[in-house]
Design a protein with these regions (language model features):
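N-terminal active-site segment of His-dependent metallophosphoesterases
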Residues: 1-62
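Hydrophobic beta-strand anchors of alpha/beta hydrolase catalytic cores
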Residues: 3, 45, 115, 150-151
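Active-site glycine-centered loops adjacent to acidic/histidine catalytic or metal-binding residues
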Residues: 8, 49-50, 79, 118, ...
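Short, solvent-exposed loop/turn segments at secondary-structure junctions
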Residues: 9-11, 82-83, 121-123, 157-159
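Class I (Rossmann-like) S-adenosyl-L-methionine-dependent methyltransferase catalytic domain
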Residues: 12, 19, 94-95, 160
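Surface-exposed cleft-lining segments at the edges of enzyme active sites
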Residues: 17, 51, 121-132, 159-168
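Extended active-site neighborhood of metal-dependent phosphoesterases/phosphodiesterases
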Residues: 57-144, 149, 171-176
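Short acidic, glycine-rich surface-loop motifs adjacent to enzyme active sites
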Residues: 145-162
Length: 176
């Protein structure tokens, strides 16, 4: 299975450039075109958070306008720049999010691999953290018998990357 990952798109309302100089909308449009034209075909796309730069609902709508051009199905999880409330509103029509509660989590078995999208965000904090409730959900999900390989995707790395300014924002309890 060919799977593509998009992350940290940092889309802003009104298609504004991020950080005063980065045209994230054009970059995402280019990525979508590349994925659609890639051969052999990409079978699914995972988007691992920081979809927006400031969490605004309008920015999520701009993201949707662009990402809806993807040919393969796509799956999203939030990052620390995303408002959970606006995330849920923007993606309420996504069937795989229908059972999410206070955090965004789901398992999709529609592909040759099982995809588990997992929310590691802490509202208004740069780092990630796994609550007991989230860990229990993940344990139960992983305990379900399947013959498929499982791919877990989330925003925060569960280990140090060696990039100092990023490692202070990683998953605090990633060893769990």
């Amino acid at each position: 299975m060919i799977l593509a990952q998009l992350t940290d798109t940092h889309i802003r309302s009104g298609r504004q450039v991020a950080y005063g100089r980065v045209d994230t909308c054009s970059m995402l449009e280019n990525a979508v075109a590349h994925i659609n034209n890639f051969r052999p075909n990409v079978e699914a796309v995972i988007v691992t958070g920081d979809i927006t730069d400031r969490g605004e609902l309008e920015a999520f709508h701009v993201f949707r306008e662009i990402i809806n051009e993807l040919v393969p199905p796509w799956y999203v999880v939030p990052g620390n720049h995303d408002s959970r409330e606006n995330f849920i509103e923007a993606f309420k029509d996504c069937y795989y999010l229908k059972n999410s509660s206070d955090f965004i989590h789901y398992s999709v078995d529609d592909h040759p691999v099982r995809l588990i999208g997992f929310d590691t965000t802490v509202e208004n904090k740069p780092y990630g953290f796994l609550t007991e409730e989230r860990l229990l959900w993940l344990d139960n999900c992983l305990a379900e018998k399947t013959q498929k390989t499982t791919i877990l995707f989330q925003h925060h790395p569960p280990f140090c990357t060696g990039i100092k300014h990023m490692d202070v924002q990683n998953l605090i309890n990633g060893k769990e």
